[in-house]
């Protein structure tokens, strides 16, 4: 699975500083006021993550579904899913505790594939 490096680095940067982003994002403010904010510490909903990365929230899950699946498989992110009404956050993403080690391992595996 190829993940565009720029997207990966942007995703990691946003998730690493998620608490700072949550203070300034319109999506977080709107969901907090309406009672739909279910974000945990150092975690962002898919709508806030899309806004922070300047992407269209309606397309982000379809566009990045394989990226999220791959990053979860290699242990870089953790995803939590909740049932929610339409136009409300359903997926919550955060970096795993050992994301840096998981990233190194994923890079090493890709390197091994290249030199075989």
From Swiss-Prot:
Domain of life of the source: Archaea
Annotated keywords: Plasmid
Protein name per Swiss-Prot or TrEMBL: Uncharacterized protein MJECL06
